[in-house]
Amino acid sequence: MKIISSLDSLFSPQKFHHTIQKSRIGCHQQLRSMPVRFFINHQLSWKTKVSTNRHCWNKKLINCNMSTTLNELRDDQTTVRRCANYGPTIWKYEYIQSLNSNYVGEHYEMKAAKLKEEVKLMMLEKMETPFQKLELIDTVKRLGVSYHFEKEIEGCLDAIYNETNWSSEDAVDLNETSLRFRLFRQHGYNVSIDVFDKFIDQNGNFKKHLSEDTVGLLSLYEASFLVVEEESILDEARDFSIKHLKQNLKIINNSNLAMLVNHALEVPLHWAMQRFEARWFIDVYGKQEDVNITLLNFAKLDFNILQAIHQEELKHASRWWENLGWDKQMPFMRDRLVECYLWSLTEVCDPRTESQYYRRMSTRVNQLVTSIDDIYDVYGTLDELELFTNAFLKWEVNLVKTLPNYMKICFLGNLNSVNELGYEALKHAGVNALPYLIKSWKDLCGCYMKEARWFHEGHVPSLDEYLNHAWMSGAIPVLAIHGYFLCASTSNNPITEEGLEAIKNYHDIIKWSSMVGRLVNVGNFQERIGTR
């Protein structure tokens, strides 16, 4: 039986408070280490070189020297503007377009298909214990190839779940219990935290002898992140496992296990980005004594084939950005196209045609939001922003004549891009998405304008006043609403009236997840500023 919870109960304001509390691969040789730059062939520094005064976030305005074209904003050529001194992108257009891979074409597709069938047989064959099947499923997931075997995995989990007698599992150790708990919860099965009761002593603490079981502790640690409200035992499990894993690192003789522990303490599985995790785990799995060579070779080949697809998508996005021309017309903006593509890749990474379409379009929306945010936060004067916001709120192309030159480019480019997305949604899903897309942009720019007025007027909002705007000005609702239509199709994923109503009124699942994202972003920003 799977967990079924209403959206309202999952994302109520009452539960919000609880919610707040990281190359191509040679298939038969050693893998190259590329934890972040996995879709690029060459080693590049991920850090952007910036000037020493990179962030100018104080109230004092700084004269930002732009090109002559940009200074044709008004007759007055001495407009004083803020400047964030964003560093230029390190991902040049020519470099991105030069990316290539050998892992394309029928030869590799046939080779991958053969290996896939062999792994599929592995998934279906009977094993000595259910735990062995769960370990295989977990390995397949961590290697990043589980999307090939979704039906097989669900079938295995259904069978194991229905055959499990949780009340008579006293002989099952900490590792197996934790793995079962994590996998079942990840796939939506109803599993009670009572399965951990047998590991608790009379004083309500985890039994002391468990501190010596490093493998079990690691499994418990990963399971502890699948927590819901009022499950304090999992919070205690996390604290207990972290404490003893750190202690055990000093005495672990198995280098592979030590690597797994260190990595998990840095990035738990529940927080990890799938493609980055897969790239890292392929290396680790290849060093294990019980490695399955067929599975390993399939994971390597699949990674390389996917990487080739991702490279082509990035090249496509780069051509769109080059043709849009914003980076040349408005050089004060952040060119973060590659980072925006990575964002979309963390959401969905499989090679299906609809997934490729989603990543390409989602990258565009992300970069549009980033650029317009810079107009409000950095470059635009208050008077210009009022005109800019008015154009967005009325969404009338004729209002472009009221805007400065750089805003004309931006407004028309954004309007055309959103209209194109609306057309694609109509073509693929049979729904007129434009009213919903336009509304999200109007609401976003309205919040941007409100915060711009706060800045220029020296107004410090109360916490409630800030939060009422922050969840929207973080732009996550805009990305979510565009994503809803990008994922839609008339056959596989049709648009529903319930869904349209939810995005129109910003259902709690949108609002509160956006709030979490915004507050986490603010916290990370303050932390980065504090370390400079």
Question: What are these model-predicted stretches?
Answer:
Residues K2-R532:
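Terpene synthase/cyclase
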